[in-house]
Amino acid sequence: MKKTLLFLIAATAMMMAGCSNDDFGGATQGMTLNATVEQPASRATMTGPNDGPYQFSFDNDDKISVGNTTLTSDYYIFTKSGEKFSCATAKPAGTAVDWYAYFPGTTVPLDNQTGDLAGVANYYACAGKTAQATTGANGLAISLTPKVAILRIVKVDNSSTPCDINITTTGGWISGMTAQSSVADFDVETSPSKVTLLSQTAAGVYYIAVPAGKQITIYNGGTKLKATKKGLTAGKYYTVTTGPVKGSATINNTTETVEWVQLWAGGPKFATQNVKDKMTFADATKTGDDYVWGKNWRTPTKEEMTLVNAKLDGHFYSITPLHTTCQIDEESGVVGLRYTGIMPGYTKQSIFLPFDGNKDYLYGNYWTSTSEIATCGTSLDVVGGISDNVDIFPAYYFNPQAYTLETTKYYVRPVLAE
């Protein structure tokens, strides 16, 4: 659904002696234009965890370029202060003409965007015109519509996958947009050489504006990610990941594979199943070819197993999302905890950790590879159950004093060794 940006421009002429005005034959100081934004959205927000409309509203110090079909000088620049835009040097036209408005200006460079959600609003190119010709002496009303879409780039890790976003369209590599003269639209500027729209090294979620309605091909570090035939819809946002968020890897140097999923950008890649048998801490912390599944896998650290926030609140632990949600679930007749990603690009990814017991009373322990106290291991200890359709947890914590005896064996959920 296209988001329309609407603002009203009210024009007033102030009379002062000593300043000539050839259009009106009188002595005036000029014309002041005030603009009021009718869009109630915040500066820049998304309407959901995945693709959907991108909401925008003007902020203080935003500028709009306004001109008409007879204006031979530069565009009038209106600046927002409080609830209104104003331009003290703007003047009404001598005859009824069409007026055009462009945000954030008549030129919008798209290279080297910052990637943050608030900053992408500065590249949110919009254009509009008056519904009918007017001098503007009694006020202007202009409805602006977006001419760009928003790409939400999910960089999946900190090092192995680059984030160097370049986009092509007919004519070359996209570099920016330029307002069309006396048309409520922008032309797409291209370059024969590669142009970087976004470059980031840290895992995370980043946002860039790209021309809407144009066939584009998206590249990351020279690798083709996506291509569109008709172009993206103006005013919407689309999620693109720089690498896979699920896959598979072999175990024990055989052809047998185990699937993995990543639950947040920069997070570990969890196997979708446990090691078959419970393990001692000594075996769980082996690495390389000595590891139970071979060198492609390892036991996660305490930090990597910290998927949610858990805080003791009275007699029970309060569980709130950190990287994932957590809920008691059942899979193939086995009770356990379902962890589902909450970061954009990961909301469809989840892992299921089986526990002993049933939905009314589940319990169990998972090893981490972390040792915080000499001769002890660190385990995730959980006791929980469902009461009156509510998940409750008498225990959900990391135990830094877990025994490392040969008789102490816990579950292990490996992660990919990278």
Question: Where are the regions that the model predicts?
Answer:
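Sec-type signal peptide cleavage vicinity
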Residues: 2-12, 16-257, 270
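Short consensus segments that form the blades of beta-propeller domains
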Residues: 52-57, 288-291, 402-405
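Short glycine-aromatic motifs
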Residues: 78, 124-129, 260, 297, ...
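Short, surface-exposed beta-strand/loop micro-motifs that present aromatic residues
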Residues: 255-266, 365-368
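C-terminal, surface-exposed recognition/capping segments
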Residues: 268, 274-278, 283-286, 302-418
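Short, solvent-exposed loop/edge-beta patches enriched in aromatic
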Residues: 95-97, 293-295, 416-418
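Conserved SET/PR-domain catalytic core that frames the SAM/AdoMet-binding pocket
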Residues: 147-160, 264-275, 291-314
